[in-house]
Regions:
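Structured catalytic core of nucleotide-sugar glycosyltransferases
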Residues: 1-131
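Short glycine- and hydrophobic/aromatic-rich loop-to-beta-strand nucleating segment
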Residues: 119-120, 138-144
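Aromatic-glycine-rich donor-binding/catalytic loop that engages nucleotide-sugar donors
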Residues: 129-139
């Protein structure tokens, strides 16, 4: 089975849509929303969707992702950003089928957009230095 982790921070306008998309995936048995102390209605909206909600103990998306991983109860974990509303309907299957079929150990998706400053000035140089085999990732911080 699959756990989907959705890190959030003030995503009241999109969280419902992302959760509903994930709920359509047959192999997902756990949806974790790890909130980074949102000031809007993100948590209230997610709670109404009957998913597991946790408040991150440290600020930042990375901390929320890490804490979600520690809380996950399944062997396959998918991270989806709460602010992306253009996911394909079968995004969870696209990301997990190669793992389930033993053709990949790790799957990283990307989308067609310009990389941001943090990606270009921090993430990519760090990947090149610490994990050269991952340096070719065009969107290492994307939420897929």
């Amino acid at each position: 089975m699959i756990t989907v982790i959705i890190p959030t921070l003030n995503e009241q306008n999109t969280i419902s849509q992302v959760i509903e998309l994930v709920e359509k995936s047959a192999n997902v048995s756990e949806i974790l929303v790890v909130d980074d102390k949102s000031l809007d209605s993100t948590v209230k909206i997610a709670r109404a969707k009957n998913v597991k909600i946790y408040t991150s103990t440290k600020l930042g998306k990375g901390s929320s992702m890490y804490e979600g991983m520690l809380l996950a109860t399944n062997g396959i974990i998918v991270y989806l950003d709460a602010d992306i509303t253009t996911y394909p309907e079968n995004i969870v299957n696209l990301l997990t089928d190669p793992i389930i079929n033993n053709t990949a150990d790790f799957v990283k998706a990307t989308f067609n957009r310009q990389a941001g400053r943090v990606t270009e000035l921090v993430a990519k140089p760090l990947l090149s230095l610490l994990f050269p085999e991952l340096a070719h990732f065009s969107q290492p911080l994307s939420g897929m």
